[in-house]
């Protein structure tokens, strides 16, 4: 008004990690900010999300969660359910993507954990064996999903009254 600019309202701009990184790189390329400033503009947690697989945002909105656990290691995974490290290795060697489902993991499960796209445990927290090993390997892990009942003999787990079988 009359040559003056008035700010009526401001809001924080929300953007994805990829967008934040692109903006920072573009600003450096244009000479508007230094590389040091660009690094400071991208949150470390945002970078972490760029290093791991993610589900498509639209697919995620349309999905119905079946249970809850701790996001012990970031990422997204899909595959066939397996219940032993040996089965995880065997199926992975055949070219199948697998999710290793265990009550909890132990050092004996390491080869199966390595073969799996993701790990799901009934017990455990952020410092559990599954969580620590999965983070170290860059594998997605949900731990502490206590609503699950695992039946190794039947090769299935039950959650919310529904059974999920191996494969």
List PLM regions with ranges:
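ATP-dependent carboxylate activation and anion-phosphoryl transfer catalytic cores
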Residues: 1-33, 39-42
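Generic hydrophobic-segment detector
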Residues: 14, 21, 65, 69, ...
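Acidic, glycine-rich flexible loop/linker segments
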Residues: 6, 10, 83-87, 95-97, ...
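Protease-associated
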Residues: 32-115
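A broadly tuned preference for mixed-charge, low-complexity surface segments
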Residues: 1-4, 45-59, 147-159
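Alpha-helix termini
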Residues: 15-16, 44, 138, 151
């Amino acid at each position: 008004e009359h040559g003056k600019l008035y700010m009526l309202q401001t809001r924080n701009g929300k953007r994805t990690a990829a967008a934040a990184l692109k903006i920072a790189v573009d600003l450096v390329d244009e000479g508007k900010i230094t590389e040091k400033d660009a690094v400071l503009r991208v949150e470390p947690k945002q970078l972490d999300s760029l290093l791991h697989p993610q589900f498509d945002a639209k697919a995620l909105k349309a999905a119905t969660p079946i249970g809850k656990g701790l996001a012990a290691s970031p990422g997204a995974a899909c595959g066939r359910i397996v219940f032993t490290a040996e089965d995880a290795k065997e199926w992975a060697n055949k070219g199948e993507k697998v999710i290793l489902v265990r009550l909890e993991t132990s050092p004996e499960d390491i080869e199966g954990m390595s073969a799996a796209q993701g790990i799901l445990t009934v017990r455990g927290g952020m410092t559990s064996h599954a969580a620590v090993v999965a983070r170290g390997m860059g594998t997605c892990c949900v731990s502490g999903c206590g609503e699950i009942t695992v039946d190794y003999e039947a090769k299935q787990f039950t959650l919310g009254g529904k059974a999920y079988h191996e494969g």
